[in-house]
């Protein structure tokens, strides 16, 4: 069964049920989620390609923002991520040098204060006139209230998760009202998870390898496991695969380590860059027919 957290929950339920009825069916979970939020695995297939898309797109947005006049402007980019900010963190890979755009990056792992955000923007204007700010859709006040909920009520999906939209638009209106500068918000939307134009070759290779490992594990009688990725301590990037108990994985959520978040919650540190760079390497030729 291939997928993310809810899929691993399904593997857990099916494998436990099969055991109670003495079924010989084997259930193996293969991780696949751009959210990169599964525990007991270094990362998940899909994240590398999505991170590459985010970094490349934010780079292009930053270039576009820089070509206009020198009047102060803010471009807010809203990126997927309800409780884990892995994808928004990947926007740091768009930078060419220290201080480059995106100047500010906010993740749901750290409580978001709108007043501090405005202060951060004003301080950033001391160094550049064209700011790009990247945010996770799930930025929140630290007490369970999402920033997007400050603007409107939201519904829930079939799994009971709040459906988030509007964090970028809320901050756009806030900046416009309080700072009076040119501002726009951009929601990267579904292309983050479905674009095939910038696939990571590393991501593709590991997805195939983990699927193959999972099939072999099932043929050996393994069940109720997820194929996890383990990064070795070698100087060069290297991954090994191993089955992990899916019951210890489902309904858990891996978030970005707090010590990887810097700038008092408004930036991403070198630890994340070192972690993510190997995952976006290599290109895959996109079929043209």
Model-derived features: where do they sit?
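Glycine-rich, charge-decorated loop segments at or immediately adjacent to ligand/cofactor-binding or catalytic sites
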Residues: 35-43
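Accessory alpha-helical/coil subdomains and C-terminal extensions
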Residues: 1-3, 9-28, 44-184
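Short secondary-structure transition/capping segments
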Residues: 13-14, 40, 196-198
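Mobile beta-alpha loop/short-helix "lid" or hinge segments that flank ligand
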Residues: 28-33, 190
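C-terminal non-catalytic interaction/assembly regions of soluble proteins
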Residues: 149-289
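Flexible loop/turn segments at secondary-structure boundaries
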Residues: 8-9, 36-37, 83-85, 141-143, ...
């Amino acid at each position: 069964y291939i997928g993310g957290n809810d899929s691993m929950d399904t593997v857990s339920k099916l494998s436990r049920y099969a055991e109670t009825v003495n079924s010989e069916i084997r259930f193996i979970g293969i991780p696949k989620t751009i959210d990169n939020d599964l525990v007991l695995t270094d990362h998940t297939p899909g994240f590398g390609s999505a991170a590459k898309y985010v970094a490349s797109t934010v780079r292009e947005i930053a270039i576009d923002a820089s070509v206009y006049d020198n009047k102060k402007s803010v471009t807010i980019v809203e990126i997927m991520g309800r409780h884990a900010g892995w994808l928004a963190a990947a926007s740091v890979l768009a930078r060419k040098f220290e201080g480059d755009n995106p100047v500010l990056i906010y993740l749901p792992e750290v409580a978001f204060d709108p007043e501090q955000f405005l202060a951060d923007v004003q301080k950033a204007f001391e160094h550049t006139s064209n700011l790009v700010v990247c945010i996770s859709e799930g930025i929140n006040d630290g007490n369970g209230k999402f920033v997007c909920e400050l603007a409107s009520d939201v519904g829930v999906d079939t799994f009971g998760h709040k459906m988030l939209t509007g964090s970028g638009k809320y901050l756009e209106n806030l900046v416009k009202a309080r700072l009076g500068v040119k501002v726009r918000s951009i929601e990267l939307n579904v292309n983050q998870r479905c674009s095939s134009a910038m696939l990571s070759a590393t991501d593709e290779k590991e997805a195939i390898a983990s699927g193959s490992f999972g099939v072999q594990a099932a043929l050996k009688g393994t069940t109720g496991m997820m194929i996890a990725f383990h990064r070795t301590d070698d100087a060069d990037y290297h991954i090994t695969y191993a089955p992990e108990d899916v019951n210890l994985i489902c309904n858990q959520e891996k978030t970005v380590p707090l010590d990887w978040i810097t700038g008092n919650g408004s930036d991403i540190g070198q630890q994340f860059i070192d972690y993510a760079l190997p995952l976006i390497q290599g290109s895959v030729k996109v079929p043209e027919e």
